[in-house]
Amino acid sequence: WAENGFRQVTNSKREIPTPEDVKGLRLRVVGSPIFIDTFRQLGADPVNMNWGDAVTAFQQGVVDGQENPVGVLVPVQIWQYHKYSTFWNYLVDPVIFYWNKKQWNTFPKDIQKIIREAAQEAGRFEIALCRAGLDGDKSLNILKNEFNHVMEVPEPVKFMESKGMTVTFLSDKGRQAFIDATKPLYEKWVPKIGEDLYKNALSDRGK
């Protein structure tokens, strides 16, 4: 597996150090029901729209903010629309490699091994790419030493701040406040997702 990075929230109104600060904000979110439920639980007004419509809504002041990983925030130059960004790591975007089992079984074992190793390598590269500059030098060194890749923006937070954004990081206590505020969602969604899958996801968290 790989990932697109941890999703952060940006907006044009205020910093968001506590769950109470989310209340009343109109935010563009992914159309998945669990995303919408999360922001409604926090008191926001989540809106599902494509990115082109979202940019127009930001410019017109119809929508206050959005949520996306840093790997999206920098390329779209989010500072053109929003002054505030809160790094709360509320969700990580997993990228899972799938293959048709029937077709997979037609490959010789040595080809399966090559494909599997290539997928693992691609996943390691993607994870490092999305975490670069956010975990000290760890991911930057992986990219440089293993893949001969140098990031154009090696320190995304400082880069965003240089563009005039205020970037807020949550303390452990602050992050726990958001966890507590969204606990009712666990009761709703864990049975739907499956207890085993939920526990496996928790055990893989941070790897």
Protein language model annotation of sequence segments:
Residues 1-207:
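N-terminal secretory/targeting leader peptides
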